[in-house]
């Protein structure tokens, strides 16, 4: 068994990087430690221009770069020096004048940055596929018993610290090896994804008219946390995150206190946070089992998130027990005190948490308190995945939203300004409610939420029952439906409950009947032309 603690000294290093962040300082430190440096192309020039002694690979191999730099390091003196097994291949290395290379610092051509540039064509993309780099990375990673491979600039400092202590341990080299294979796997996956979208039916292969979906789907996530169990205790689980999340979310949040997040905590917190991000004014979202059970926007600037919380909680005090609470403003002491003194809560998440609020929540040591940072108004395009037996459904993320200018009034009566504000509020909430979804709202507070029913009219009935149970009046409220009404009974029920305005996508074969039902009841109705199914 390999000794995990024995340190491997470094006498010779090969440095060839596209991203030169920190490389000059790294090379200087290696030189100060007596390490001989081999280098190539632009990296060699950078070192030479800054007084760092280095040997150009072409001088070492006796073989000049050729084919516009396509062939630089693909040489036995390079790969023999990397792959050579110490104590086994020494004689053959000596016979062929191959010197051992103990450390390889390489990162790859910026393929991702290249293909993301406007106007990038296929030949340009192809020229930015690195060949020599991944080959060296894989060689060094394979022979990690004798060679250290460094692909991340963030590891330079740790490597130098270890070298000053006598060398890198096997445990460190193993970790660097794993990072290297993860790096090349992500790189090759990115290339396969891109090439898999090229229009092969065109007379000339081009990236014009590219498919959104590659022939094989390659995506890499990094394990952030192993969990005690999954959705249920008999299931195992872990939480994986993107290497570069495109926007603030549960994956970027910092846990300030509390028990370890569970599988269900992560899923529910994501639902709550994504919903509250829909609102500009101070808002609160309370979620239970991935469904909003209470949502509110503070009706006045002075009320802040404390008032939003009070209104959201009032929607469904029973379901709020053991729920997830999300805010779109800093959690302040007053709001934190109101929460911990009133209810049992699993998770509280906000862009930031004041020191006073943090001290208050600390009295409830098990409460998971998260700060996620501020987010921009624009939602990032991304992919959503759903596992099915033997396959994976992939779709673009639902970031569609509408404003008042997008509403199509289809009834005789147009909604008032207040009704429009409430309709858009209810529509934003309905987007995050499991289908079939019905939301009653008034003054930008949810009055009743009907979720997950097989029949839309039953969701409407349940939302009304929930409102009555909470002591809230559906009369005078508005109603949002995540999809069209297939029959007029949905509108008839809305009229019976006292709803004054309705927002829905439209598009049913019976739209005319539904509109007639609204007109008969004097209900204002608008179509969005956009559906928000959520399964």
From Swiss-Prot:
Gene3D superfamilies listed in its UniProt record: 3.40.140.20, Methylglyoxal synthase-like domain
Entries under PROSITE patterns matching the protein: MGS (PS51855)
Swiss-Prot/TrEMBL keywords: Hydrolase, Multifunctional enzyme, Purine biosynthesis, Transferase
SMART domains found in the cross-reference section: AICARFT_IMPCHas, MGS
GO biological process: 'de novo' IMP biosynthetic process
CDD domains: IMPCH (cd01421)
Residues covered by the MGS-like domain: 6-151
Family annotation (InterPro entries): AICAR_Tfase_dup_dom_sf, Cytidine_deaminase-like, MGS-like_dom, MGS-like_dom_sf, PurH-like
Free-text domain note: The IMP cyclohydrolase activity resides in the N-terminal region.
PANTHER family the record matches: BIFUNCTIONAL PURINE BIOSYNTHESIS PROTEIN ATIC, BIFUNCTIONAL PURINE BIOSYNTHESIS PROTEIN PURH
Protein name as catalogued: Bifunctional purine biosynthesis protein PurH
């Amino acid at each position: 068994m390999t000794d995990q603690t024995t340190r491997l000294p470094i006498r010779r290093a090969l440095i060839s990087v596209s991203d030169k962040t920190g490389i000059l300082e790294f090379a200087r430190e290696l030189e100060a430690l007596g390490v001989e440096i081999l280098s190539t192309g632009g990296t060699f020039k950078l070192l030479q221009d800054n007084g760092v002694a280095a040997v150009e690979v072409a001088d070492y191999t006796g073989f000049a770069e050729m084919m516009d730099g396509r062939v630089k390091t693909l040489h036995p003196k390079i790969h023999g020096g990397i792959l050579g097994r110490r104590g086994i291949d020494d004689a053959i290395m000596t016979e062929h004048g191959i010197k051992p290379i103990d450390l390889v610092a390489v990162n790859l051509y910026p393929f991702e940055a290249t293909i993301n540039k406007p106007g990038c064509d296929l030949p340009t993309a192809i020229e930015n596929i690195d060949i020599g780099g991944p080959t060296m990375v894989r060689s060094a990673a394979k022979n990690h018993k004798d060679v250290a491979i460094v692909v991340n600039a963030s590891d330079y400092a740790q490597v130098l610290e270890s070298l000053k202590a006598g060398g890198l341990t096997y445990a460190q080299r193993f970790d660097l090896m794993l990072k290297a294979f993860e790096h090349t796997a992500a790189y090759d996956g990115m290339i396969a994804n891109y090439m898999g979208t090229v229009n092969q039916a065109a007379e000339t292969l081009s990236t014009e008219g590219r498919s959104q979906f590659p022939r094989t789907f390659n995506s890499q996530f990094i394990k952030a946390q192993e969990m005690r169990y999954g959705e249920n205790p008999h299931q195992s689980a872990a939480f994986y995150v993107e290497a570069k999340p495109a926007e603030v979310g549960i994956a970027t949040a910092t846990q300030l206190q509390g028990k370890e997040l569970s599988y269900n905590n992560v899923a529910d917190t994501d639902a709550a946070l994504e919903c509250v991000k829909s609102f500009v004014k101070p808002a609160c979202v309370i979620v239970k089992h991935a469904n909003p059970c209470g949502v509110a926007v503070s009706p006045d600037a002075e009320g802040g998130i404390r008032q939003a919380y009070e209104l959201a909680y009032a929607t469904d005090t029973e379901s709020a027990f053991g729920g997830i609470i999300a805010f779109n403003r800093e959690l302040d002491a007053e709001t934190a005190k109101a929460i911990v003194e009133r209810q049992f809560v699993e998770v509280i998440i906000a862009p930031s948490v004041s020191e006073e609020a943090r001290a208050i929540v600390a009295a409830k040591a098990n409460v998971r308190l998260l700060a996620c940072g501020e987010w921009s108004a624009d939602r990032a395009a991304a992919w959503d995945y759903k596992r099915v037996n033997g396959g994976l459904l992939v779709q673009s993320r639902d970031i569609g939203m509408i404003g008042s200018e997008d509403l199509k009034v289809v009834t005789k009566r147009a909604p008032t300004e207040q009704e429009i504000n409430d309709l858009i509020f209810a529509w934003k909430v309905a987007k995050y409610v499991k289908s079939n979804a019905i939301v009653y709202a008034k003054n930008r507070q949810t009055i009743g939420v009907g979720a997950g029913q097989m029949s839309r009219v039953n969701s409407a009935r349940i939302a009304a029952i929930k409102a009555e149970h909470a002591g809230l009046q559906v009369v005078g409220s508005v109603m949002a439906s995540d999809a069209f009404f297939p029959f007029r009974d949905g509108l008839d029920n809305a009229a019976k409950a006292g709803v004054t305005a309705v927002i829905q996508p439209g598009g049913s074969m019976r739209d005319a009947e539904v509109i007639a039902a609204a007109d008969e009841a004097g209900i204002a109705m608008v179509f969005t032309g956009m559906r928000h199914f959520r399964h």
